[in-house]
Amino acid sequence: MSSEELPSCGINDNDINNTIPINTRKVQIIPNGNTQCVKCLYNVANNVKDKKLSKKEKKEQKLKEEENNNNNNEEPITQQQKPIGKPIINFRSEQLCWECYRELILKKFKLNIVKVRESKRDAEKLLVALSGGTCSSMLLELLKQCTEGSGKAKMFLDIKCVHIDESSITPYQNHNDTIEFLKEFNNVKLGFPNLEIIPLEDILGTVTPLGERTNQLKLQFAQLSSETSKEDLLLYYRNQLLIQVAHKLNCKKVILGTSSNRLAVQLVASTSKGRGFSVPNETSVIIEQPSNDIKFYQPMRDFLLKEIFIYYRHLNILPVPVMFSILNLKPKHSINTLCEDFLHCLQDISNQTVHTLLRSVDKLISPSIDSNYNCSICSSPLTSAEIKSLEKVILDNNNNINKENKNNNNNNNNNNNNNGCCSTTKTEDSSCCNKTEDNSSNNNNNNTGCCSSSSSTSTSSITVNKETLCYSCKILYRDFKSTPNIAPYIKENSKQLLTTSQLKNEIKDFLLNSDDDDDDEDN
């Protein structure tokens, strides 16, 4: 294969320079036609440099070689006899053979997977999200190689796999074949027996029958007016199900097979949708979840899609049956597909596009966040402006409730003087609430009676308060054509956030500021 026919992947960044020092890069380009693996040539060049030893060391080495020749009657292995593989890929402008390429991919993967491990001796429980695509399949293959090593190279990992069945929303073309293939691939090929198939309908709970939940889920997505909102809601539901399964299996770490291309698309799409505040966290190797103790890891962040496909092809893994009936969507289908098409065009023009974006986002630092304030739908932290808006709404609601209470108390007092509903007379038929004493009527006005001041507020049950959502999710919630029967976890998160914010608003006058503590210490 000539150098022009080799697939080109990525850019010439510092990763390959860390593997092959810069001072030997001139040696790599010397061969005519560049039809040999660069790393193999580097190994040869490195051996040549090692032979430039002192006279004593050269004599000792010759004596050892002569002894070996006399004992084994074999010719010594020289530098020219070492095999040099044929290049199969231009890995970031460097030509590598399959063995060197496989070794480099595994090395880069281990550097990221080490960040997941907290203990080198105890087996780490990992939950791997298996979608059935190329990236997740390669992720499992690399994890298998990490667990099959010997000695120090072996990692002790307790791997459990989960597949979110989205056939109710995005129908699979060969649903049964896909599920059977995933089970066979996971159990037989890789040897991971723990595979769970979780339907997407479980996001609505498990109390109602599956058919009823399927209809509710379809109706919920049908009410969304834009395809972008449908894709985002599907992503949030999928992540929430992964968190629930992780809690169920007692796994605190979820491993995703997200490639660098997908993260670059997510970076541009999230910024265009107003989610720039959470971009540094969502595109890093470790995704923090402020609302719970589950963390998401993306160890394949450094690999391009083309690099993953070439690795996947050389492993001779059976292809997954076509899962979706529509694979090639139009670029203007949604914001996500539009950003994906835009970045693919830039990547074809310049190989530096994806890695430049990811290196740029690595330099971004999110401001300090309050872990108590998270979006009810996507669980991303709210900005300081959104928190202030939420506190303002709660303060206005409290003021309105106080005004209503005062007005109701005045009306009740007037009605009591006029023998109204809660009359103070001792006749049994003149009082609808059976109040016969002034004290009893005044006390019951503070409770939930027929003339209670809180009756109007208790009956108005708000399912999801828009102020508990981030900017992007507010747009998503606005896209619903009618009030949706949304997932229970969203209502629960919204209610909890409102309660927390209201409690903080009530006790804020009794809290001590840090400035006051400093003044006390100075005195």
Swiss-Prot record:
GO MF annotation terms: nucleotidyltransferase activity; sulfurtransferase activity; tRNA binding
SUPFAM superfamilies (alphabetical): Adenine nucleotide alpha hydrolases-like
Top-level taxon in the UniProt lineage: Eukaryota
Entry-linked InterPro entries: CTU2 (IPR019407), Rossmann-like_a/b/a_fold (IPR014729)
Main subcellular localisation: cytoplasm
Keyword tags: Cytoplasm, tRNA processing
Subcellular location: Cytoplasm
Gene Ontology terms: biological process: protein urmylation; tRNA thio-modification; tRNA wobble position uridine thiolation; tRNA wobble uridine modification
GO cellular component, one term: cytosolic tRNA wobble base thiouridylase complex
Pathway field: tRNA modification; 5-methoxycarbonylmethyl-2-thiouridine-tRNA biosynthesis
Segments of skewed composition (Basic and acidic residues): 57-67
Region (Disordered): 53-81
HAMAP family xrefs: CTU2
Protein name, UniProt field: Cytoplasmic tRNA 2-thiolation protein 2
Organism: Dictyostelium discoideum (Social amoeba)
Gene that this polypeptide is encoded by: ctu2
